[in-house]
Amino acid sequence: MRNTKLLVVIDESEASKRAVSYVAGIIGRGRRFKVCLAHTLPEIPAHLIEHGGAEDPGDEEKLERELHSDQNQWIVAARKKAQPFLAGARTVLRKAGLPAGSIEERYCDPAEGRARGDEILEMARERECHTIVVGSESLSRWRQLLGDDPVEELLRRGKGFTVWVVE
């Protein structure tokens, strides 16, 4: 029998904590399970999306480099802020009996022009996770960001995946 790998999407919400607890309760001491914790970082602030531009190509290039550097610094800070949430989720899974080597951590960085649902599905494919677990409160934030229902998007585009939505 092959290992079963779950992608558990987390953020700072209570729903994410419930999703992790639910997964811990379901798979507990199961040795054939692996979990990929994927922390979804918030969208990059508007002031870091683009600059005002410049007439001189050299100045434009410099502004682009600075903007890219500022975006990278913002992502590094957001990842650092997310570390306690990942550590907490890891602790819950470990206390339930999941071996440390069966848990990995990833970040779902904000991608320019891509829907969050697409990013999650791509990560699930790359990590070979066949089940995606999300908390419902975190989905409310996604609805605001995406302007539509990410659960429906995950279900519509996620052919071949099982999606667990934890209330």
Regions found by a protein language model. Give the residues of each.
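Gly/Ser-rich helix-loop-strand patches that form or flank binding pockets
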Residues: 121-167
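A conditional alpha-helix N-cap/helix-loop micro-motif detector
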Residues: 16, 113, 144-147
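Conserved beta-strand segments of the P-loop GTPase G domain that flank and frequently precede/overlap
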Residues: 8-10, 37-39, 106, 134-135, ...
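Hydrophobic structural packing positions in well-ordered secondary structure
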Residues: 6, 23, 93, 120, ...
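Short glycine/proline- and acidic residue-enriched helix-loop micro-motifs
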Residues: 64-76, 103-105
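Structural beta-alpha unit
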Residues: 91-131
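Low-complexity, serine/threonine/proline-enriched polar segments
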Residues: 73-88
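Small/aliphatic-rich secondary-structure junction motif
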Residues: 1-70
